[in-house]
Amino acid sequence: INTFHPKNMAKELHQLYGELSKEDLVEKNIQGISIAGRIVLRRVMGNASFATLRDSSGDIQIYVTKNNIEESIYDDFKTWDLGDIVGVSGSLFRTKTDELTIEVSDLEMITKSLRPMPEKFKGLTDIEARYRQRYLDLMTNSETKEIFIKRSKIVDSARSKMNERGYLEVETPMMHPLAGGAVARPFVTKHNALGRDLYLRIAPELYLKRLLVGGFDKVYEINRSFRNEGLSTKHNPEFTMMEWYEAYTTMQNQIDLTKEIILNAAKSINCDEKIIWDDMKIDLRSFSQKKLSDLVLIYNKELNEKDLDDRSALEKYLKGLGKKTDKNWGTGRFLLEIFEETVEGKLINPTFVTEYPVEVSPLSRRNPDNPQYADRFELFIGGREFANGFCELNDPDDQASRFEDQATAKDSGDKEAMDYDKDYIIALEHGMPPAVGVGLGIDRLVMLLTNQSSIRDVLLFPQLKN
């Protein structure tokens, strides 16, 4: 039974009394302080001892002496170990070294630690152990804890921005009858009662757009998605996305909102707009906007504008880059492959890339001026994709045709191709207003703003190999 109820936190005590001098503390005679925390440091010196307690907010020193507590309790205290969770009560004073300290008048053991702390509490330095035993990492590395505090603030800032703009937060299914909403390989599970396969969602897109059909004009969701792909410093099989849809808006409005969300997130954790990420200097004030085809020509001087419509020329060029090709690819897929190979990694400052080929944008509306391209954008920062958005395809016949193309690709062995979603086509036949949707990777945004090079460092419990 828990009988100790702390009234104070370490950070609070430092904030309230950290500026008071030794004389001020004596004059104010601040009694009734009580705090609970883990012993992270201790120095036993006969009849008096010092220890450092760590709670969820920070550290504070305590001073325990036989003069203030029962001798038997003090003798017990001398046998307590690093890692034990204790509760103390007392008054505040400053030591000769000017450290704010609790002079203990009462203390009790709350939880006994049966295992020793790693590295004598200097921190868990083995990277693999930090991920597998995150509780020890959080316990010993204040920098790790700060990352996840910042992550929470970043998510909160994004949610606040969407609510401020009148969006409705919703929750859509995590298990789907069909794999759709993005081009990726899904996880498959079986529902025993229904006797059928279900797929962990790779994106919430098709359900969120059903809500547009139903009459919600502004919706968003912050939640997990799953992709059955490789593990790396950039990818985890489950990850957090914020995806939103707005009817009757423009792609440019949503580009501007995406930028606003990112800058607001940086502000929420007091992050400078000029940052270092993975040894790259990035200026968050320097957003630019360029067409994908223009970027391909800029970074591939051997290609000219005519080559962009020449399948054989693009295939030859891609093979020259040492990349494998597929006979089922059209010019759009070749163009995207060349972009990913030669351009993507060079987009260091924030860059919105627009006008993707329709062939690789199965859910995007065609550009009315150039139908082989879609009204779509992706945001790249530090050579990595952060967001993907487009004017939503609301023509059921065009969408059905693209689903058929995806189904053909799947039959030809493309494990990432989407299924034909008949129910979604029926929804579109009821009429979906013109809309723009955007997906923003939360994990990658946290990596950027906290200067972490691995996605595992911004996930509390990342997926690891055995």
Task: List the predicted regions and their residue ranges.
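Class II aminoacyl-tRNA synthetase catalytic cores and aaRS-like
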Residues: 1-466
